[in-house]
Every structure is written in structure tokens, then in C-alpha cells.
């Protein structure tokens, strides 16, 4: 869409990162942490122009003097005042657009409480005066981005993981499973196991350093026991990482022990099934006739599925669980970190979608409840 005047805005608010941009683009223009920071101490320097809150990258860069809060927990918005700040920052500072001039497509977690959807709708129309808006389920958008309408999506981000079976474009709510195990838990676990090695990471600012170590060095082992043996026998798996203060730390079996907890949540002291079993359980909750189609279209999406080796391991684990004759295919597109946003960009630019928007007029006539009738 070349005329930016009417391009829809696509905003994917994740627990960890907010992705925003224009419908029709192939990648989000703005990607920033879903963080609101408030100063820990009163400013000493008068006239420094200190703000009472910072959002996104600015909050991140000033993290030493701020208390950081994430308004989205486990995929669901829990702090609306901070969320409004994030949306304001998205429109005015990141995309530099007037929200009253563009339709806005927002995303939501599967099984998002009804009241939450209504509140999102209300804020868009009443605070930002958008002409039209729509709320789409994240996993469904990821499936669209992979060019499918049927499949099961394993969407794992920073705050929550979901397995969502989708048939002919519709999510099957009775078979959606939620796993409160995602990137943030893995970062915390890596902090813990690095502490055992003698490196101490405790503050919110240091957690961000550990997150970076995780993203750069961690991977999923195909065979955990064998990998542990290799790590014990030689130093071939060790990598070094330079901290911001110049200190260099070495990390060995932590590289694969950390993401292994996706498959063995008992590492984190959790009793839930791993991601492979969750996918399997989700498929088993579906009608027997569509399972074959789901096994052949297992789509990975979200930042926590970015570990090298995760798709091969998933293939191996699901193959062990499923009937032996069945064809299993794991789809892990390289751009899966942003596939929810990309799916939103595709959806909002379809000509057939244009009648799906909730207009300001419809909202004024029916109130926030309209979102349940038009977005499903």
C-alpha cells in the first residue's frame, strides 16, 4: 500500500517485545521492549527535564536508575495505565502517526478474557479515537503468515506459550492449551544456573544481560544425556561472553541446559508437560479426522522457538509420541520471531478483510461488546 494515508497499523503487543508497523509491509518498523520504567530516586539535578516515566528502549537504556515494569504478563495485559503509555509511545514516537487517521489491528493471546478485549476496544476508540479497529488471535496470524489455514501453532514468546489447533482458519478453543513457561522463565533459569557457576546476576538490569547471553549462545540438544556427556568430557561446547564491564565469562552445558527446560519443565520445578507433550495433548483433544492434518502442519512461532536445534528435537519427540504411520512435519520459518506481526500485516491488507473492521460508528452504537461479535 503506497498511500500511507489509509494504511492500517498493525500492533502486536507481546509480553516481552512490542512489534508495530504498517499493513502491507513485510516486517514491523518498530520493535521495542514492552517496558515502562519509573525513576527509583527523585532527581537531584534541577532542570534536567526528568520524565516521570520512560517506555521501551529509552527505559532499557536508563535501566540503572529505573524500576522496570512489564504491563503484559503471560500474554495478557494486566496494567492498563502502563499499556496506554506503550500504545501512545507506539503511535506517536515509534510510528509517528496520528491514530485517529488509521485503522488499527491489535493482537491478543488465545483465551484472552472477554473483559480484556472490551477494554482494548474501549481504549482504542475512546483514548486514541481510531476510525476502526480489530483484535486478532496471535497464533492464527502466525498460521496465516506461513501460508496455511489449517495446522497447529506452537507460539512461545517471552511470557507464555500456547498450542493452538486451527482448522480452516478457525481456532478450536476446546483444544487450546496454555503453558506458563516461556522466554522470561528461561532467562530466570539461566540466571540461576550461572549463579551456580559463580557469576552473580540479580537486578532487573542484569537480567537483560542474561537474556542477551541466552539469545546469543543457547541451543537445544537433540539428545540431552549425550550432550551432557560431551560437555563433561571436553571443552568443545564452551563459549565465552563479554559482559558490559569487560569481564569475560565462560558458559558450557548451561547453553543447552537452559532451553532443555522447554522439554523438561521439572528443571524449573514445574509439574507441567513439556512443549512436545503439550502439542501432542492439544492434537489429541481435536477430532480424530483432523489430527493427520495437524501432525503434518506443526508451525512454530515466537522468539522462544528461535533456538538452534529446536525443530529437529521437536520432530524427534513428536515422532516418539504419535502413531508410527503418521507423517509429521515441523514448520519453523526463519522469520518466526515476527510471524504474528507478519500475519497481521497480511490480514489487514486483504481486500476481503476490509468489511471485518469494527468502525467507530458501530462502537458508538453497540459499545465494547461489539468486539465479541465481530472478532472471533
Swiss-Prot record:
Assigned EC number: 3.6.4.-
Tissues where the protein occurs: Muscle.
Reported modifications of this chain: Oxidation of Met-45 to form methionine sulfoxide promotes actin filament depolymerization. Methionine sulfoxide is produced stereospecifically, but it is not known whether the (S)-S-oxide or the (R)-S-oxide is produced.
Pfam families, sorted: Actin
One of the record's GO cellular component terms: cytoskeleton
Protein name in UniProt: Actin-3, muscle-specific
SMART domains according to UniProt: ACTIN
SUPFAM superfamilies per the UniProt record, alphabetical: Actin-like ATPase domain (SSF53067)
Keywords of the record: Acetylation, ATP-binding, Cytoplasm, Cytoskeleton, Hydrolase, Muscle protein, Nucleotide-binding, Oxidation
Residues of the propeptide: 1-2
CDD domains: ASKHA_NBD_actin
Native organism taxonomy: Eukaryota, Metazoa, Ecdysozoa, Arthropoda, Hexapoda
Entry-annotated residues carrying Methionine sulfoxide: 45, 48
Role description: Actins are highly conserved proteins that are involved in various types of cell motility and are ubiquitously expressed in all eukaryotic cells.
Family: Belongs to the actin family.
GO MF annotations in UniProt: ATP binding; hydrolase activity
Gene3D superfamilies, A to Z: 3.30.420.40, Actin, Chain A, domain 4
Class of enzymatic activity (EC top level): hydrolase
InterPro entries: Actin (IPR004000), Actin/actin-like_CS (IPR020902), Actin_CS (IPR004001), ATPase_NBD (IPR043129)
Residue numbers bearing the N-acetylaspartate modification: 3
Amino acid at each position: 500500500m503506497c498511500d500511507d494515508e489509509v494504511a492500517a497499523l498493525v500492533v502486536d503487543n507481546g509480553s516481552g517485545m512490542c512489534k508495530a508497523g504498517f499493513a502491507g509491509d513485510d516486517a514491523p518498523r518498530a520493535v521495542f521492549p514492552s517496558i515502562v520504567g519509573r525513576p527509583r530516586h527523585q532527581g537531584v539535578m534541577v532542570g534536567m527535564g526528568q520524565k516521570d516515566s520512560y517506555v521501551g528502549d529509552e527505559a532499557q537504556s536508563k535501566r540503572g536508575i529505573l524500576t522496570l515494569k512489564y504491563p503484559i504478563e503471560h500474554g495478557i495485559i494486566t496494567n492498563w495505565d502502563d499499556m496506554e503509555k506503550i500504545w501512545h509511545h507506539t503511535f506517536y514516537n515509534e510510528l509517528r502517526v496520528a491514530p485517529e487517521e488509521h485503522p488499527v489491528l491489535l493482537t491478543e493471546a488465545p483465551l484472552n478474557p472477554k473483559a480484556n478485549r472490551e477494554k482494548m476496544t474501549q481504549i482504542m476508540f475512546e483514548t486514541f479515537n481510531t476510525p476502526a479497529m480489530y483484535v486478532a488471535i496471535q497464533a492464527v496470524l502466525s498460521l496465516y503468515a506461513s501460508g496455511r489455514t489449517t495446522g497447529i501453532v506452537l507460539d512461545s514468546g517471552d511470557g507464555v506459550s500456547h498450542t493452538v489447533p486451527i482448522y480452516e482458519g478457525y481456532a478450536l478453543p476446546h483444544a487450546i492449551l496454555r503453558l506458563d513457561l516461556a522466554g522470561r522463565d528461561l532467562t530466570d533459569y539461566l540466571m540461576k544456573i550461572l549463579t551456580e557457576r559463580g557469576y552473580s546476576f540479580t537486578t532487573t538490569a542484569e537480567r537483560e544481560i542474561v537474556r542477551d547471553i541466552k539469545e546469543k549462545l543457547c541451543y537445544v540438544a537433540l539428545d540431552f544425556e549425550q550432550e551432557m556427556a560431551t560437555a563433561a568430557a571436553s571443552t568443545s561446547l564452551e563459549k565465552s561472553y563479554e559482559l558490559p564491564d569487560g569481564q569475560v565469562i565462560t558458559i558450557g552445558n548451561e547453553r543447552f541446559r537452559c532451553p532443555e527446560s522447554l522439554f523438561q519443565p521439572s528443571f524449573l520445578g514445574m509439574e507441567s508437560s513439556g512443549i512436545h507433550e503439550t502439542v501432542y495433548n492439544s492434537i489429541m483433544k481435536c477430532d480424530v479426522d483432523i489430527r493427520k492434518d495437524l501432525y503434518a502442519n506443526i508451525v512454530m512461532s515466537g522468539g522462544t522457538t528461535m533456538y538452534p536445534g529446536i525443530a529437529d528435537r521437536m520432530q524427534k519427540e513428536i515422532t516418539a509420541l504419535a502413531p508410527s504411520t503418521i507423517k509429521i512435519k515441523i514448520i519453523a520459518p526463519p522469520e518466526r520471531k515476527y510471524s504474528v506481526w507478519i500475519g497481521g500485516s497480511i490480514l489487514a491488507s486483504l481486500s476481503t478483510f476490509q468489511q471485518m473492521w469494527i468502525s467507530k460508528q458501530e462502537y458508538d452504537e453497540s459499545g465494547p461488546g461489539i468486539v465479541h461479535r465481530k472478532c472471533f
